[in-house]
Amino acid sequence: MTSLTQRSSGLVQRRTEASRNAADKERAAGGGGGSGEDEAQSRRDEQDDDDKGDSKETRLTLMEEVLLLGLKDREGYTSFWNDCISSGLRGCMLIELALRGRLQLEACGMRRKSLLTRKVICKSDAPTGDVLLDEALKHVKETQPPETVQNWIELLSGETWNPLKLHYQLRNVRERLAKNLVEKGVLTTEKQNFLLFDMTTHPLTNNNIKQRLIKKVQEAVLDKWVNDPHRMDKRLLALIYLAHASDVLENAFAPLLDEQYDLATKRVRQLLDLDPEVECLKANTNEVLWAVVAAFTK
């Protein structure tokens, strides 16, 4: 409770100081007209980002968030028994690309097709700045005829019996994501000896970022629960679904008290019981998101 109070007071101090600095700059500029208003709005936007605790250095992709939830803090690797996270991370990539305006589903036409039969098409091939995302986007763009969401999850994971399609597999995804997190100051890199071989591991070095991620997931199904997926932030909704599909959501709920844990899992179950075919017809939805959900919950 004390640490929460300290963080809150710290945010207030930063907010007050930022407002004071912005006011001083505006007075020094002498009003400034329209350009001054634009600069003030830009400063407010930057301040909002700081208040959320999401600076450019620590803003994580969906894939990085799911991996971070699955990594053991001290050991620096995911559970050897987790065989779900590989496909889960590929689902994250498709949703991340869709949220960034790069992918969409083909039009459903007069005879409405199901989400799982509609093909994924490239909406924009503009680089994202993320090597893994750009690699996946290149595959989708260059593949004719197009593939469905479920096929892409399997192809990007290398789960295909067709030797002509093995080149679609994205290799060393977890290691590459971990290196991204190292560059962002979240993880570090170590070598550990496992009997007959050495293994590169990535222990947690910035616990604040992981705790903030865990708190965000917990609050989404507890204190900030809205009982309507369309009123939730799409990225957060996708994180809950994909963390569950990757079998790492339990790690975010482990610290909860029994009553909170039961309530959180009950609300996640409510989300899992939704029909993606129905939800994708509602206003302001992302069809790729619901298609990925359908692929994992069918």
Curated annotation (Swiss-Prot):
Task: List the taxonomic lineage.
Answer: Eukaryota, Metazoa, Chordata, Craniata, Vertebrata
Q: From what superkingdom does this record's organism come?
A: Eukaryota
Q: Which segments carry the region annotation Beta-hairpin required for oligomerization?
A: 190-201
Ranges for the region named Disordered are 1-57
Function text: Phosphatidylinositol-4-phosphate-binding protein that links Golgi membranes to the cytoskeleton and may participate in the tensile force required for vesicle budding from the Golgi. Thereby, may play a role in Golgi membrane trafficking and could indirectly give its flattened shape to the Golgi apparatus. May also bind to the coatomer to regulate Golgi membrane trafficking. May play a role in anterograde transport from the Golgi to the plasma membrane and regulate secretion.
Q: What is this protein called?
A: Golgi phosphoprotein 3
Coiled coil ranges (UniProt) are: none
Spell out the post-translational modification annotation for this entry: Phosphorylated.
Q: Which Pfam families match?
A: GPP34
Q: What residue spans carry the Basic and acidic residues bias annotation?
A: 14-28
Organism field: Mus musculus
Q: Which residues bind a 1,2-diacyl-sn-glycero-3-phospho-(1D-myo-inositol 4-phosphate)?
A: W81, R90, R171, R174
Which family is it part of?
Belongs to the GOLPH3/VPS74 family.
Instruction: Write out the annotated subcellular location.
Output: Golgi apparatus, Golgi stack membrane; Golgi apparatus, trans-Golgi network membrane; Mitochondrion intermembrane space; Cell membrane
